[in-house]
Amino acid sequence: MPEPAASSRGCVLGFDFGEKRIGVAIGEHLLGIAHPLVTIDAEANDKRFAAIAGLIEEWQPEMLVVGLPSYLNGDEHALTQLCRKFARRLEGRFNLPVQLVDERLSSAEASQTLKQSGISGRKQKSVLDQVAAQHILQSYFDGLAS
């Protein structure tokens, strides 16, 4: 895991929002590489935002990236609006720019990545959301490079 001092190189936090858990990843604009960081395992908004505030204080990101889910055909579903609301709250509470990124298939890709690494079952469940956040953030970085 990178050190908190990485913020001087353009630290970015990425989020895979879920109603029960939020996966968090970290990366740097300079390197363009995302890493899984942590899973926030709380349903209550006050606990979620307290955990996020701690991460923002520790890592001092210059911006945030939030995955925006949709159906494969691009149509939005119920979680899409919740993610938009989450992104607006992040921007309002922390006064940081928030970029929404298409997250179709991020959880499936994360699960595949973990299986290829020999991680399955309960262990996979404990890190799946942060690896999905890693895929979302990496997608953002890859979009900048193209």
Curated annotation (Swiss-Prot):
Any Pfam family the entry gives: RuvX
Subcellular location: Cytoplasm
GO BP terms in the entry: rRNA 5'-end processing
Keywords: Cytoplasm, Hydrolase, Nuclease, Ribosome biogenesis
One function term, GO molecular function aspect: nuclease activity
Source organism superkingdom: Bacteria
EC number assigned by the record: 3.1.-.-
Classification via Gene3D superfamilies: YqgF/RNase H-like domain
Gene Ontology cellular component list: cytosol
Main location: cytoplasm
InterPro entries: RNaseH-like_sf (IPR012337), YqgF (IPR005227), YqgF/RNaseH-like_dom (IPR006641), YqgF/RNaseH-like_dom_sf (IPR037027)
Major enzyme class: hydrolase
NCBIfam families: RNAse_H_YqgF
Family under the similarity heading: Belongs to the YqgF nuclease family.
Its biological purpose: Could be a nuclease involved in processing of the 5'-end of pre-16S rRNA.
Protein's name in the database: Putative pre-16S rRNA nuclease
Organism: Methylobacillus flagellatus (strain ATCC 51484 / DSM 6875 / VKM B-1610 / KT)
